[in-house]
Amino acid sequence: MGCRGPWLHTCLLWAAVASLLLPPAVTQQLRGAGLGPSTWINNAGAPGPSGEAAAAGLGHHGHSHRSPGEENEDVSMENGHHFWSHRDHGETDDEVSREYGHQPQGHRYHSPEAGDESVSEEGVHREQARQAPGHGGHGEAGAEDLAEHGSHGHGHEEEDEDVISSERPRHVLRRAPRGHGGEEEGEEEEEEEEVSPEHRHRGHGKEDEEDEDDDSTESDRHQAHRHRGHREEEDEDDDDDEGDSTESDHHQAHRHRGHEEEEDEEDDDDEGDSTESDRHQAHRHRGHREEEDEDDDDEGDSTESDRHQAHRHRGHREEEDDDDDDDEGDSTESDRHQAHRHRGHREEEDEDDDDEGDSTESDRHQAHRHRGHREEEDEDDDDEGDSTESDRHQAHRHRGHREEEDEDDDDEGDSTESDHHQAHRHRGHREEEDEEDDDEGDSTESDRHQAHRHRGHGEEEDEDDDDEGEHHHVPHRGHRGHEEDDGGDDDDGDDSTENGHQAHRHQGHGKEEAEVTSDEHHHHVPDHGHQGHGDKEGEEEGVSTDHWHQVPRHAHHGPGGEEEGGEEELTVKAGHHVASHPPPGHRSREGHAEEHQTEVPGHHQHRMGDTDTSAERGHPASSPRQQGHPPEDTVHHHRGSLKEEVGPESPGPAGVKDGSRVKRGGSEEEEEQKGTHHHSLEDEEDEEEGHGRSLSQEDQEEEDRRGESAKVQAPLRHHREEEEEEEEEEEEEGRLPFTIIPNPLSGREAAGGASSEESAEDTGPEDTQEYGNYQQGSLCGYCTFCNRCTECEHCHCDEDSMGEHCDQCQHCQFCYLCPLVCETVCTPGSYVDYFSSSLYKALADMLETPEP
């Protein structure tokens, strides 16, 4: 043992010189001559016969006597493996970490004593840990060596044992510069030619298995550890280090990762269930493995380190993935943004129905950017299903284009207030160009806004029936759908309640078709004074299409205000307006002037069957500019109907309701009359003159009726208010079973000088139930009596001396005591309360005095 140190030192020098100077062929021959067994002492490390074998062993003693520079040369050039416990230089670390990057830390930092622990056991544990991730498949042939050669990799071990020793010098010489960052693509070929050092060590290790003795000294064990480090460093094919490597390997792992990612043309290495520490080691060797291995290295579930690479390529994959974004139906919000990038193109080419189903709100914004193009090309039905409210705003942007292509009337139904402004801008174009159907089914409120955004385009194309299904209008919604009754279609099926105001908001624009009465839907949008663009189209000269968006504030309009406002206020107050509820839509068919008016409960439904005059109960009030030109006969016809409606009007339940009903009486008359003004008739200019003549007459009559109705309703309203007050009082009394205190204003005051008995009789417990003023002592007769005792109120006695009784006031003392008792003792409904009631009667009898 004493001489082994210098001997190993000498052998180490020779080995280093030989590896550096001799050609690869000579070195291979020397290696193959049997020097390997002693060189690769595995666990026991039997003493080798030759000096070179001992030098290859790289004993700790040799290192202890070597300078760092010599160690670097010998170790790095000869074996390319650095035992970190003996190396103090960062360059050594760089060589090792960059070159093989998978030295177990356990061996890097082992002291000689630490190395005495069973190397084979550590190797086995470490080997098993590395096999766990699933890399053991590379070298099942070497599984038998795991116990002894714990750090040997599995891959290609058995195949290359013959060539290991001969290839080793060449490999080492090339590996040394590579450790410093010289790993380049050109060296991949060299790596492929070279058998991984692991295999070289395996070859020697197997020869050493026969020579291993159990009597290995500590120095042998240190050598074994030393070579184990080298074996494990050279373990390129095996991903055995992916097992339980510590976090210090992370840094080395990432050094090689650059090469790995550059050369990874195949699948990203999906590493199985390796932990984060495994990922970093696994990726150290992955560069080499992937450089040599262009086939798929399918390692199950890729860990987080793979994800970063995977995402690098994902961008390209997503850029090429143009097909998946086509499903606009139930796409989630994250998909919407990409999906809609391509949607514009698809929608531009889509001349058929673009059935957009339940697109979410985020889809709507992008989807509708391109929708303009789609709708310009979309000559067929644009069946837009359940699109939400957010689409409305963008839809109107493109409506102009769609409406410019349409040539016929576009009957717009229920447009929201915000849509009124835009809708009217494009409505002129839409009404000029409307040719085809825009079949919009059961669009909800949110659908109305979108549907009608695009309806401009659809309705402009709408010569046929625009079968707008049931438009569901929510009362008091400012944004009610643009369910415009398009192209003179009957929205017969549209039983839209409360749509009257909305449906008619936009319909006022030249829905006057030659053969039919114009479907003028006059919309009272709350607080909207936007009046129509009287569009009279060429031969279909319709009545002025005015969109009367007037405030239906019926409760606040006084009779005087109605008269001053002309017919505008009256129309706003049309019988359809109950309080703030908008009346249902009025839809008139082209061939039939019948109105299908489904009204809010309490509203009068008028189905006027005039083919010439669609007897719509026009919501808007007609100022002279707003009034159409219906024939006089139609004016009178509606006038009669108005009178019929006004007659049965009954006063509202209270205050605001009364006001709305009163106004309804006058406004219904005017509304229907005004509605008739806006119905385009088959007669053109001749009838317009007739309409003009009838307007002045109607105005006068309407004003008269309005004044009369206001006068009639005023007394009724007042009477009704009184009745309601009385009813409320009765209800309050009914709710309080122990109501006592009478109302002093009720007029039931006892006459002056009345006896206590009389007052007691007047204010018995039964009588006290009538009163709603509750105080303590609900049944207490004292309280009742005292509150009603006029004698006490007029008593001239000295209040300070209540003990005295005056002749005029006989009950002062009684009334004085009563409140004290009630406040202190008497609880409503309690025993004392009942007792006090009985006591009251007794006292009343005792104090009873005959009247003077």
From Swiss-Prot:
Any one of the GO CC terms: sarcoplasmic reticulum lumen
UniProt Sequence repeat ranges: 59-79, 80-100, 199-224, 225-253, 254-282, 283-310, 311-339, 340-367, 368-395, 396-423, 424-451, 452-470
Compositionally biased intervals (Basic and acidic residues): 79-101, 146-157, 509-536, 587-619, 630-646, 658-681
Localization: Sarcoplasmic reticulum lumen
Segments of this protein annotated with the region 2 X approximate tandem repeats: 59-100
Superkingdom, taxonomy of origin: Eukaryota
Keyword field: Calcium, Phosphoprotein, Pyrrolidone carboxylic acid, Repeat, Sarcoplasmic reticulum, Signal
Region (4 X approximate tandem repeats): 471-585
First and last residue of the signal peptide: 1-27
Residue ranges of the region described as Metal-binding: 780-826
GO molecular function, one term: calcium ion binding
Main subcellular localisation: other
Transmembrane regions listed in the UniProt entry: none
Region (Disordered): 44-770
Low complexity: compositionally biased ranges: 44-58, 746-757
Biased segments, Acidic residues type: 184-195, 208-217, 233-246, 261-275, 291-303, 319-332, 348-360, 376-388, 404-416, 432-444, 459-468, 484-497, 722-733, 758-769
Record-listed Phosphoserine modification sites: 120, 518, 544, 614
Modifications after synthesis and translation: The N-terminus is blocked.
Modified residues (Pyrrolidone carboxylic acid): 28
Region span, 10 X tandem repeats, acidic: 199-470
Functional summary from the UniProt entry: May play a role in the regulation of calcium sequestration or release in the SR of skeletal and cardiac muscle.
Family as reported in the entry's similarity comment: Belongs to the HRC family.
Protein name as annotated: Sarcoplasmic reticulum histidine-rich calcium-binding protein
Organism of origin: Oryctolagus cuniculus
Gene coding for it: HRC
